[in-house]
């Protein structure tokens, strides 16, 4: 290796080390040592299931920093509301002495067995594209009226174009009630990316009260929503 190449290599390695050590916060200017990030390990299930009306009880967690216990430095934030069916999150975060932080999240599913407002797993397909086990929530709005977070069953937001939100809204939200035969009575349509591409008058199928399953065809997009169970 010639002298110029050696000098370039030394410069690049030095620059990489500086980026690693100074990329946490501006006050670390001039720091030239390696910093260690906290590691957080969740105990219990993820997702964690709570029945409607039950209190969420923290299953536990541990944290370490360079092999040493760091659990007492973990901060927790949560939006869990066990009085409303849905998918919530508990976020665990910790910051090291250099200002470098790490976080991880536990999903909490609040289930409503036998109810229309519940957490579901979607199976959706159109043509050769087929996606399964996508989490979808139906929330209560008022007496007999519900909001389905995505009439497409996650086909676009989780299946075909994952990671594009929030830049693009691929959740086809609708508010609806059910007719006596279980079919949809669409009351409100959300303003999402492909709204103009679908005919909302062309929805066949619907809800089966005996199985608790939604099975329908939305203008050529087939969706089955099955209540989530462990």
Which positions does each model-derived feature cover?
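A generic structural motif
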Residues: 64, 93-95, 128
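Beta-strand secondary-structure signal
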Residues: 39, 60, 89-91, 105, ...
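Serine/threonine-rich, repeat-prone extracellular segments and beta-strand-based repeat modules
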Residues: 68-106, 110-111
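Ser/Thr/Gly/Pro-rich, low-complexity flexible regions
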Residues: 114-230
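Extracellular interdomain linker/stem segments of modular secreted and single-pass surface proteins
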Residues: 35-37, 109-118
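Well-ordered beta-strand positions in beta-sheet-rich domains
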Residues: 28-29, 103-107, 133-137, 173
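Bacterial Sec-dependent N-terminal signal peptides
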Residues: 2-6, 12-46
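Solvent-exposed, low-complexity, repeat-rich "mucin-like" stalks and linkers
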Residues: 36-68, 132-134, 153
